[in-house]
């Protein structure tokens, strides 16, 4: 371990694979960010950003946004599709449409919308009335594309139609049969020609956590017979020319490229058939599904993807192009709604470790000669560990069984508290000793080695709410890369489990990227008694903010944008303070003014003097105006 360096930590945390070239660990052991791919040497030290924010009065937890990463991801997506179009000889265009449901924060939408000079090639997608109104106000350029998905009522459809009068190109995607009649009615009433799209239910579907959002059992989309009925309805009204867009969606976070290949082939057949039936389809929207490799394993795990961005683009472009060449059809504009791939990398949640409980060897002596038999048995097992060829698995099983018997006898009143405590400490010592003796390379030892690694890991209490900031980690077991921000030039000799500050046993991180796999504990260096430890949760820019809930009334964290200036230096802008206690109380209809009145009445008790009364009221006011998370005094 004496030759350990930051390069070793890079491998342990698998940073080169999930970091997409944005994240690194420098020689001093600090995590860095290179947000602008055109300036790879311009690096930001995350610890420096946190220190600068602290000097300005902001404590952790804080969400750091890197708008330059958003721009880099937009460029990467356009470059991948541009190269695929050029290599394949595809005659249509590519249009990137950002579905704002992935992250509706105003600054995120603005950064994405403004990040490409050729604005008509970058559109927005809405899935509800509030999202549509937001999208209509964000796009200012003539001809900006807006795709309208989701369930729709007449008001939604009217807003979409009126968007065309504002100069936008608004596609209303019919996702259930009843929507067509509403579109026809409202367009006739407003005398606005609609741009209609249709979402096809494919037989193909992606595997993984979100597979139910695609395929024939999806809650959205039209079956083959329903699409035929839609075409005949439009043909009968002389409005078949309004049907301009074909849409499908395999599901979010598609891990296996073969699922994408199958979906594209099936979509291509739908395109060919719709053209054969007279529909003037100009746009094929392949939806979302472009995966993010959260683990860095390049695998078919639901938190990974076994393909690159360029491979995805090649499969989409070549797949649609092959159908067009086979049937001599015009090459449609290709739209992808790759929101997760655009936004995931740009945000990092940073928080501090407020305390830790480690598992260490206990200094205990042999039981007295007249001690109960069960304690004598446990001590014998402990001594057996020092024999020439100990049976490690048997010793562990016996120790677990003996401890169970101790707890039973304690409950029955046969053992006292001191004896129970002695047994617990001896069992802990046995586990620690076994952990050092087990060989993980030995297949027979591997399961127990993993069990003890988790059992003996440090409990690290992190100043954040898993339910607010990483809801997918709790709800669906999503893996997010996490690592300390400093000290990584030192050997990672400890294992930890991160626990949040909510009053819920589910509030802990259960999965950690470790090498080319995922483990149940986090590798960590040893920190000094007065050395502060900050940890970063990476790739949290997609879905997490909007899905977060208010468990224990922990609300939004502080947020700040971290830019690179013209000289490649860190420039922190657009700082937004997190929710205060009084704001959170209002969310659940608790009026802070009523709390103040009740406090006034309670402290008016004659037993309290004026100074004490004032101190209590001042403390209340500080609490109401303060950050919901733990703060240093």
UniProtKB/Swiss-Prot annotation:
Q: Where does the chain bind substrate? A: 284-294
PROSITE patterns, A to Z: ODR_DC_2_2 (PS00879)
E.C. number: 4.1.1.19
Q: In which pathway does it act?
A: Amine and polyamine biosynthesis; agmatine biosynthesis; agmatine from L-arginine: step 1/1
- What's the domain of life for this entry? Bacteria
Enzyme category, top tier: lyase
Cofactor needs: Mg(2+); pyridoxal 5'-phosphate
Write down the SUPFAM superfamilies for this protein, in alphabetical order.
PLP-binding barrel
Report the residues modified as N6-(pyridoxal phosphate)lysine: 101
Instruction: Give the protein's biological function.
Output: Catalyzes the biosynthesis of agmatine from arginine.
* Family membership: Belongs to the Orn/Lys/Arg decarboxylase class-II family. SpeA subfamily.
User: What protein does this entry describe?
Assistant: Biosynthetic arginine decarboxylase
């Amino acid at each position: 371990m004496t030759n350990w360096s930051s390069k070793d930590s890079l491998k342990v945390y698998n940073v080169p694979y999930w970091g997409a070239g944005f994240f690194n660990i420098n020689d001093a052991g600090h995590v860095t960010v290179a947000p602008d791919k055109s300036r790879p040497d311009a690096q930001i030290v995350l610890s420096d950003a946190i220190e600068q924010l602290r000097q300005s009065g902001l404590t952790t937890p804080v969400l750091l946004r890197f708008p330059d990463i958003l721009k880099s991801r937009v460029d990467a997506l356009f470059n991948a599709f541009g190269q695929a179009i050029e290599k394949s000889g595809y005659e249509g265009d590519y249009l990137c449409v950002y579905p704002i449901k992935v992250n509706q924060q105003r600054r995120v939408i603005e950064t994405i919308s403004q990040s490409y000079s050729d604005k008509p090639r970058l559109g927005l997608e809405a899935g509800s009335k509030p999202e549509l109104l937001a999208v209509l106000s964000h796009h200012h350029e003539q001809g900006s594309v807006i795709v309208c998905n989701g369930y729709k009522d007449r008001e939604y459809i009217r807003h979409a139609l009126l968007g065309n009068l504002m100069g936008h190109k608004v596609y209303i995607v019919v996702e259930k049969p009843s929507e067509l009649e509403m579109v026809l009615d409202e367009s006739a009433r407003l005398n606005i020609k609609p741009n209609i799209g249709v979402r096809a239910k494919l037989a193909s579907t992606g595997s993984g956590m979100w597979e139910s959002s695609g395929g024939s059992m999806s809650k959205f989309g039209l079956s083959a017979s329903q699409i035929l009925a839609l075409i005949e309805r439009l043909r009968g009204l002389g409005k078949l020319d309004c049907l301009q867009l074909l849409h499908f969606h395999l599901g979010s976070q598609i891990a296996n490229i073969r699922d994408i290949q199958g979906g594209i082939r099936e979509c291509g057949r739908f395109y060919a058939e719709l053209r054969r039936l007279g529909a003037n389809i100009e746009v094929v929207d392949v939806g979302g599904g472009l995966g993010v490799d959260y683990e860095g394993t390049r695998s078919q795990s639901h938190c990974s993807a076994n393909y690159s961005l360029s491979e995805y683009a090649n499969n989409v472009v070549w797949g649609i192009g092959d159908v067009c060449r086979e049937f001599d059809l015009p090459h449609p504009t290709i739209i992808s709604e790759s929101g997760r791939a655009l936004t995931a990398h740009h945000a990092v949640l940073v928080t501090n470790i407020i305390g830790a409980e480690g598992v260490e060897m206990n200094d205990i002596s042999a039981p007295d000669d007249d001690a109960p038999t069960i304690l004598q048995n446990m001590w014998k097992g402990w001594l057996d560990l020092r024999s020439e060829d100990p049976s490690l698995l048997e010793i562990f099983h016996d120790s677990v069984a003996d401890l169970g018997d101790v707890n039973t006898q304690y409950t029955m009143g046969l053992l006292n508290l001191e004896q129970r405590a002695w047994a617990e400490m001896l069992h802990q010592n046995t586990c620690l000793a076994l952990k050092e003796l087990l060989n993980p390379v030995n297949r027979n030892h591997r399961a127990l080695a993993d069990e003890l690694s988790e059992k003996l890991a440090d409990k690290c209490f992190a100043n954040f709410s898993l339910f607010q900031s990483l809801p997918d980690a709790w709800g669906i077991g999503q893996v997010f890369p996490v690592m300390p921000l400093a000290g990584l030039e030192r050997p990672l000799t400890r294992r930890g489990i991160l626990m949040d500050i909510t009053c819920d046993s589910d509030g802990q991180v259960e999965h950690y990227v470790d090498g080319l796999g995922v483990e149940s504990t986090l590798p960590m260096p040893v920190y000094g008694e007065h050395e502060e430890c900050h940890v970063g949760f990476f790739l949290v820019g997609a879905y997490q903010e909007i899905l977060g809930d208010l468990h224990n009334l922990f609300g939004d964290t502080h947020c700040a944008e971290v830019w690179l200036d013209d000289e490649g230096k860190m420039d922190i802008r657009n700082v937004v303070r997190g929710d205060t206690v009084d704001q959170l109380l209002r969310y659940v209809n608790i009026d802070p003014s009523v709390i103040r009145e009740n406090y006034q009445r309670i402290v008016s008790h004659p037993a309290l003097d004026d100074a004490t009364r004032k101190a209590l009221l001042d403390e209340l006011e500080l609490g109401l105006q303060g950050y919901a998370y733990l703060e240093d005094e």
